[in-house]
Amino acid sequence: MAAPRTYLAIDLKSFYASVECVDRHLDPLTTNLVVADASRTEKTICLAVSPSLKAYKIPGRARLFEAVQRVKEVNAQRLQTAIRQKKAVRGEDGRYHFASTSFDASALNADPALGLSYIVAPPRMQRYLDVSTQIYKTYLKYVSPADIYPYSIDEVFIDVTGYLPYYHMSAHELAMTMVREVLYNTGITATAGIGTNLYLAKLAMDIVAKHIPADKDGVRIAELDEQSYRYLLWNHRPLTDFWMTGPGTVKRLEAHGIYTMGDLARFSIHGEDRLYEIFGVDAEILIDHAWGYEPCGIEQIKSYKPSTNSISEGQVLSTPYPYDKAKLIVREMAEILMFRLTEKKLVTESITLEIGYDRENVDKGGYRGLTQTDRYGRTIPKAAHGTIRFDAPTNLGSTLINESAKLFERITDPALTVRRITLNANKVTPDEGFYQVDFFTDTKKLEREKKLQQAMLGIKNKYGKNAVLKASSYEEGATMRQRNAQIGGHSAGGSAGGSDGKLQK
């Protein structure tokens, strides 16, 4: 039997929002701030919400309009308090309003008559990457890169098994030491989970730590092993709180009377075959997790190589796009895929395109086709999708762009406006430099195109992605220039120093 291991999961608290607060010399734990690109629309997603603003039941990934609406509701209640305390001001129109507002939770708690305000900070993805790298280097002072798995920009797993005897520390002490140094260096608080496997470390951080008191710096550290997991979490609801258990899985479990991990564990004793009928090979993961088991460690994660790979480009458009403008976006996205494949020296066997239509097509009343429900429960036209396979793997722009445009024409309803586009390059493999040719193939032309792509890529890497652009990228509705200035679909922004933000009242 393998020797027991000890893992840490560390999550930086409201990371993007905390960076924005620290760069403004504000306290991340008491400052009301959201990170969102208000220049788009109020439908834009809030990339982060500060802890003090979350306390007003604003979720971390709310749409901006949802945050705005919730603050209005809170202020309506606070204004009544101000009126009762005779601290409100009456305007010329006879209406009451706040004499003062604050975005600091301490001030708001001390004076219930203050109006709640908050800062809307535009995202600065490059700054967040820089701070994340700085924090990663802090972890490296204590452990080897081989024992760290960065799960996301603000979350890591660490195998600390061999380091506990070396430092003469418990897992809790080592976690606190690293978290304290991160706080000292960056001003950012973290939450940590300790577990006998990766799954339990993650749950200790995600679920258990949320229900224990924080220290004076907002730090929470929780621990789980198989036995304490069963005692503490077998009756926990909802199941969606558990790592890797999404709404679709939960819906199927509940259809069979399974509402908790304890229910699932007990069901698996005699109903294992039924679980495999429902979930296929994924049943093994569900059963293991129900009992608190996870055989996979960091070494296995790092050594894993998927049997197939793909590269994806996707975007949600800021406004509904008509057919012709949406087609322009597809061509731009195919060009971006071409450069990504060229840079990685990869080719693709096929492309898949998915077109998501806007809700206005249904709201206007003329649409009579198939529909589906979006994440907000609204009815929208059923998305269109299709795939084109190439005669031979390729990364040539002429093929990718033209075939993507043809696929768009084939699957998209010209009468509907488009809101979401996803383009995938499927089954990507290393470029061996071969072509499938016949008597009509101009191999010299193909070589010239490939060399031109590589030259353009070199210019972009040296002078910026917008150094070389097609004329079509300057047409109305084109998004490539803006997206080239983004990281992960959001503004790269500046580096150190707080960027401009808007104070909302």
Give the role of each language-model region:
Residues 1-288, 295-298, 443-505:
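Gly/Gly-Pro- and Ser/Thr-rich, intrinsically disordered tail segments characteristic of DNA damage-repair
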Residues 2, 9, 241, 247-417:
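DNA-contacting surface of Y-family translesion DNA polymerases
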Residues 162, 196, 357, 392, ...:
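Non-catalytic surface loops within mature trypsin-like serine protease
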Residues 363-367, 433-437, 481:
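Short conserved micro-motifs at the rims of enzyme active sites and ligand-binding pockets
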